[in-house]
Amino acid sequence: PADAFATLIGESNLVVVTGYGATGANFFDPTVPPFLNTLTSIDEGFGYWVKVNNEVTLSAEGVSLGGGFAKDLAAGWNLIGYWLENSQEPADAFATLIGESNLVVVTGYGATGANFYDPSVPPFLNTLSSLDNGSGYWVKVNSAVDGFTYPAAGLARQIASMHQETNPEIVKTNEFMFINGEVNFTDMDYTVGDKVEIRTESGMLVGEMKIIAVTDEMLDEFDDFPEFKCSLGDNLLMTAPIYGDDWTTEEIDGAIKGENLRFIYNDIEAELTIEYTGTMELAKVDLEFRFIPDAYALRQKYPNPFNNVTTI
């Protein structure tokens, strides 16, 4: 790592690098004695988390891995790179694993934060739409895979990305989980396209879910996913990340594992809470927001002023 990131280290821009392999998570911090670091090598086919102080384009020299490169996957989580030159959609990149019912989930991370792909949910609920050269991805599989390879991506083409608006109040960290679900509103107004806030016990905003209404087009997609039961006009909550605390900073900037999370819309809080896990996996919720008046009044019976008794 000291060689691979020498330029960043020389500019005092590198904070930390973490990797994940057969022995689990490992770590490199340029500010500590070398014997305290457990990440000792940057290896082909792997992905790495790199935290820097200032935005920078990282360049590296070497021989292209080529389309025939293969990498073993362990059962469970794997942090791997995408080594093909041309981008492709997750459904194509992992078609073999999906066909074998071996792929559980894929997560990525970009300019808008964390994104998510689950082959078992309708496509519109996924936010990871493209695998790109130079990026790394968390891939979870049920069973180990010997010699995983990406299929040929074909000609270079522009893949439509999933546009995600991000609230600057939310601190995007490398600790996160995902959430989606359904929502109902009772005795109150709401607007499709608004967002339900996800806050910690202390009130910190750590995520938002967009309210979407089920359309005819979505119902067509549900035909391939019989376990999903929805009707036209039902309100769903779009898949979104919930960010946890960044251990590299002194201040608390995200949810703490085990902490209860609250859901708020227009200052009204849902009764349901969930626990923050930070496992990168998906939680599902069924929220209900209900307007409950906090003030009542009795008014004079009218237009009969001669009757001094009113029955309620």
What annotation goes with each model-predicted range?
Residues E175-G181, N308-I312:
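Structural beta-strand segments of beta-rich domains
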Residues R290-I312:
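Glycine-centered coil/turn sites that cap beta-strands in beta-rich domains
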Residues N180-Y190:
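Structural motif
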Residues P1-F176, Y190, K195-D286, F291:
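N-terminal exported-region signature
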